[in-house]
Amino acid sequence: MAANTDRNSKPSVYLQEPNEVQGVFNRFDANGDGKISGDELAGVLKALGSNTSKEEIGRIMEEIDTDKDGFINVQEFAAFVKAETDPYPSSGGENELKEAFELYDQDHNGLISSVELHKILTRLGERYAEHDCVEMIKSVDSDGDGYVSFEEFKKMMTNKSGNNSQAEPPK
């Protein structure tokens, strides 16, 4: 995710820049061979706290692996990311957003806290202070309660206006 150099603007979580997509892809590509295997995908999902079954990993791989070579390359990954952040998602889009939200909502109370965000980022190998996570939450928290609800998360993930007022971990 790209660094934000303008101190007055808030960073964005959207993976719009090729280097941002490549950076996230590289986190999944544990062995650095330029492709994501089912085992690598399972490892990242496990690090995020998901107990995804082998069958579900297979379904995810099948959905993203459009050339059917058994791996996800960076182009397939980028196409998937673009589809997942489409402001007009397919009928299954909301369910997929809900699943993503639930990965962050560790205590399953329907809200993402700065503590939960910090835990997930730490599991992903990101090094952010808790106050950074508080700021990320604030930038998406439209009702000011200190948490991100599913509706706030959905709005953030489907916003394509080019508005960079959404949260991304500062680098």
Curated annotation (Swiss-Prot):
Keywords on record: Allergen, Calcium, Metal-binding, Repeat
Positions annotated to bind Ca(2+) 1: 29, 31, 33, 35, 40
SMART domains named in the record: EFh
InterPro entries reported for this sequence: EF-hand-dom_pair, EF_Hand_1_Ca_BS, EF_hand_dom, EF_hand_pair_protein_CML-like
Positions of Ca(2+) 2 binding: 65, 67, 69, 76
CDD domains from the UniProt entry: EFh
Quaternary organization: Homodimer.
Protein name: Calcium-binding allergen Ole e 8
